């Protein structure tokens, strides 16, 4: 049988089939490599998210417990005298775009926060006075002034001044205002420490620590002692192993000479030997006709392309 050469359409279809198989193979290989990586990343992200969620829950529970402890203790905090903006009901905005702190006059309604944390408390008391700042640098020299000139007096000429004797001393004037602080001294001695502040409140108990390392082995104990105690009798033990047969007994008394009656039937005998082969049986009836034959098992005939 003569096979014709492939035409252009068949060659084009072959190229398309080869390209499709190559793309499918590459997609399968990339999915085999990419899916485990994506699964590992998602699993690690889920584990990290669960850890962060548990940590957030723990911190929120600790803060809630601390708020309850502070509420039960009844500790009040006073507002600071300076350094904070006066509070208002709406919370005004401060410099830089940040809201000012809420004062005691703020109207805080009963709200429920998802993080179980209340609003910010009032400002604390004023801190200690800070140390004096360093002296500033000297300023630049000023511009020289204009030259003065003698002007004629606009007042009429006065009588010649008569030198009078000094009068009595006047009364003592009021004390003047306090002058500015002087420059920083050059003494190398350290100033005295300030007084200690009041002790703070006891914080909540910290989280339990990790399991410590096992300690060194302890000293050896004293050797044991056997103490004899006469207790009650225990239960009977299990039955022992059967012993060996005893010695042969003495000969018995001679039997009677009379004939006894018929004894009981004996045990059944064993199976007999296999019997010989029997004669052949008669011929059986004729069987039904078989199925018609088919060509399913035959290979397909080879035909030229395009047939």
UniProtKB/Swiss-Prot annotation:
* One Pfam family recorded for the sequence: Col_cuticle_N
Is Repeat found in the keyword set?
A: yes
- Please explain the role this protein plays, according to its UniProt record: Nematode cuticles are composed largely of collagen-like proteins. The cuticle functions both as an exoskeleton and as a barrier to protect the worm from its environment.
Organism this protein belongs to: Caenorhabditis elegans
Name of the featured protein: Cuticle collagen 36
Stretches of Gly residues bias are at 86-102, 258-278
User: Got a GO cellular component term for this one?
Assistant: collagen trimer
For the region Disordered, give the residue spans. Answer: 76-102, 116-307
Q: Which PANTHER family match?
A: COLLAGEN, CUTICLE COLLAGEN 36
The UniProt keyword set, sorted, is: Collagen, Cuticle, Disulfide bond, Repeat
Keyword Repeat assigned = yes
The entry's family comment says: Belongs to the cuticular collagen family.
Where does the record place the region Triple-helical region? 89-105, 118-150, 167-187, 194-226, 231-257, 260-295
User: A GO molecular function for this record?
Assistant: structural constituent of cuticle
Q: Which stretches does UniProt call biased (Pro residues)?
A: 157-168, 202-220, 279-288
State the source organism's domain of life. Eukaryota
Q: Where does this protein have compositionally biased stretches of type Low complexity? A: 231-242
| Segments of skewed composition (Basic and acidic residues) | 186-196
Name the SMART domains on file. Col_cuticle_N (SM01088)
Under the subunit heading, UniProt states: Collagen polypeptide chains are complexed within the cuticle by disulfide bonds and other types of covalent cross-links.
